[in-house]
Amino acid sequence: MKVLALRHSVTQVYADTQTYLHDDMKDDYENAFLISNLTVHNILYLNYSLKTLEILNKSGIAAVEVQGIEELLALIRCNFTYDYLNNVVFLHDYSYYTNNEIRTDQHWITKTDIENYLLPGWKLTYVGYNGKSTRGHYNFSFTCQNAATDDDIIIEYIYSNELDFQNFMLSKIKERMTTALPIARLSNRVFRDKLFQSLSLNNDKIVNVGPRNESMFTFLKFPSIKQFSDGPYLVKDTIKLKQERWLGKRVSQFDIGQYKNMLNVITTIYYYYNLYAEKPIVYMLGSAPSYWIYDIKQYSEFVFETWDPLDTPYSNMHHKELFFEKDTIKLKDNSILYIDIRTDRGDIDWKEWRKIVKEQTLSNLNIAYKYLSTGKSKVCCVKMTAMDIELPISAKLLHHPTTEIRSEFYMIVDLSDFKNIKRFVPKGVLYSFINNITTENVFIQHPFKLRKMKNEYIVALYALSNDFNNRENVIKLINEQEKSLITVRLNNTFKDEPKIGFKNIYDWTFLPTDFNTRNSIITSYDGCIGMFGLSISLSSKPTGNNHIFILNGTDKYEMIDQFANHMGISRRSHQIRFSESATSYSGYIFRDLSNNNFNLIGTNVENSVSGHVYNAIIYFRYNYSFDLKRWIHLHSVDKVKIEGGRYYEHAPIELIYACRSAKEFAKMQDDLTTLRYANEIERYINKVYSIVYADDPNYFIGIKFVSIPYKYDVKVPHLTFGVLHISDNMIPDVISILNQMKVELFKMNITTSYTYMLSDGIHVANVSGVLLTYFKIYNVFYKKQITFGQSRMFIPHITLSFKTNKTIRINITKLKIESIYLRKIKGETVFAMTE
């Protein structure tokens, strides 16, 4: 959903679009709630309130002020992520395909021969980090840039087994044009930047679990963040390999040698970060022209000093000369050294060439060892070739993708590796490594151990659901960790499957009720980003690959109307009720009937069940940004912080009724997951609320009316407005509450319209118009620890006779209250009041 705020209406008609006119009779929160539950994708919001826009954006729903038709067209034709704090729109707009154009935000790609392999007549355009270079395309009242690129396709091609790039690109573009936009993945780059900038301001120690290559630029500016990944491939791990021969396989049609060099250097930088938590000087020998240095500097400033007879235009200091072992004295501490020296083969005979390569490899190793032999805080990444050689057993082997699989690989060596024992590795084993192992991640840090960390803030996005992690340990970590943002896979199966297949692995599935957290927010992607100054135009969909975002230790926990709130909670219900169901009242009717309340007159106005809780349970797959457990808990301990707007607090019994309705709904849908969720929410309600039922009552509150429009033979026809189980010394407290509620009680618009047999031999009249006040007084009694109300549904009625009688229907008739009283069952009236 996207909300586009306009001061004036527009004459054009757009698909999937609705106009909403701000209702001045309602507060900003109610306007925001009504907007959030509209079922179309585009909302044109007229006469808008800035506060309403703020409320929507904090809820993760993109709401942007639009000044003219060009801005409107730009935002209505695509999806986007909105930085509402800085008024920046990040479009995810692929309409540039109509210019026969693909886009990249990696400068090095523009320096390759990739355009020779594009679709006929197509070109490649560099658009800068997150599309920053496109800002000049939009002369708007807000900052706008198009973050959409085709880098995902290019990188997927590089790691695939396909060689024909044109066919691969064509297939992926057609797929992009015929499937739903993976909005969370596109938006995630924007979110990660905001997230870690925000966390770094307030946390000295941050741990990041499971980063992948898509994050390789993000963390360059955060050397102190401790990374955990799948671990490195060590020299000693080659003992498992069988010997092989040279393969000579081409990986990419266009030259990706620069990509390999960039990944090698970035891998070395992160390895250095993990050891020393600071930025190093980057020394490079060879690898000219290294256009990718420009890409790194777009994200974070580094000092590059390079040696190569060829130009290296983006180096801070380039020496257009060869580097020799004796020159290592020029290299300072607190640095990394990348050695990529290799003479071009030219027309040299193969055997002679192999001899030269081996000599250069040994020379490279000598430079590396000489560099590491003195000083401190140093890491070296050195180019190697498959040959019989002795290597440190703890050195890290790299084989990032390159244009052709031949004889080369790379090795990271640090000070401890240099001093470690060496082992002989045969040439055939190294060929086996080169032929079969591709380094898929620039993060080669050791795996994360599932245990609580005392002073660290843990971030684990899409990293802990894999079934090689112990599920109970994942839950334990989330329950115990004081400060963290962790995601787990949402169980949106219908058979309550504990695992779901994903690519070539399995993920554990989770529900919010699996966690016993305190001071944490459990929400969706859009609910989470709202807390970090972002909103999104396309909300989470039940794709089967959805994740719960769990934030521990957030200062926004008690702000239930601002973040991870109830915005959009009825949207799925509206989509069904106003399109597919038997009546738009279907939800109200079902909730009453499933709780044995058969008086459906005015059910849409006076419903006996919390619609919020009911919708949050049965449609949890569609809207899990609303943190239901947090909402329940904060109400139970009376710590709700409401910023503004009219607010209705549910009685705990309303929540129980909602769970009962949700369970019956789940059974009818054969939805085992929702059935478990509803049962667990009901247990949670009973856990946090101390609900005691007056199933053996000794007092009741009665309402006597001036007149009853039916014949009766009971002594005093009255409405039993709830029963109590109290001691006599609590009577003054009950009377005090009745006096406190007197105005509201007498203001009730009570009506009746028919009679019916409540059970055998009990003829009663229906009563409408009292439930809202009943639940309100229930809450007051609950907070005063006075036992009020029974475990069965409260069905308002007036007993007329203890004989069997026919049903009578009359016009809706208002009943005027004569008095309200407290009376002992089978005893005397102890209190009465009149208007």
Swiss-Prot record:
Active-site positions on this chain: 718 (for 2'-5'-phosphodiesterase activity), 720 (for 2'-5'-phosphodiesterase activity), 797 (for 2'-5'-phosphodiesterase activity), 799 (for 2'-5'-phosphodiesterase activity)
UniProt-annotated location(s): Virion
Record keywords: GTP-binding, Host-virus interaction, Hydrolase, Inhibition of host innate immune response by virus, Methyltransferase, mRNA capping, mRNA processing, Multifunctional enzyme, Nucleotide-binding, Nucleotidyltransferase, RNA-binding, S-adenosyl-L-methionine, Transferase, Viral immunoevasion, Virion
Main location class: virion
Region (N7-methyltransferase activity) residue spans: 171-245, 429-555
UniProt region (2'-5'-phosphodiesterase activity), positions on chain: 693-835
GO molecular function annotations of the record: GTP binding; hydrolase activity; mRNA 5'-cap (guanine-N7-)-methyltransferase activity; mRNA guanylyltransferase activity; RNA binding
GO biological process, one term: symbiont-mediated suppression of host innate immune response
Entry comment, domain topic: Contains a bipartite N7-methyltransferase domain, a 2'-O-methyltransferase domain and a GTase/RTPase domain. The C-terminus contains a phosphodiesterase domain that degrades the 5'-triphosphorylated, 2'-5' linked adenylate oligomers produced by the host cell in response to IFN stimulation.
Subunit structure: Interacts with VP1. Interacts with VP2.
Official protein name in the record: Protein VP3
Protein's organism: Rotavirus A (isolate RVA/Equine/United Kingdom/L338/1988/G13P12[18]) (RV-A)
Highest classification ranks of the organism: Viruses, Riboviria, Orthornavirae, Duplornaviricota, Resentoviricetes
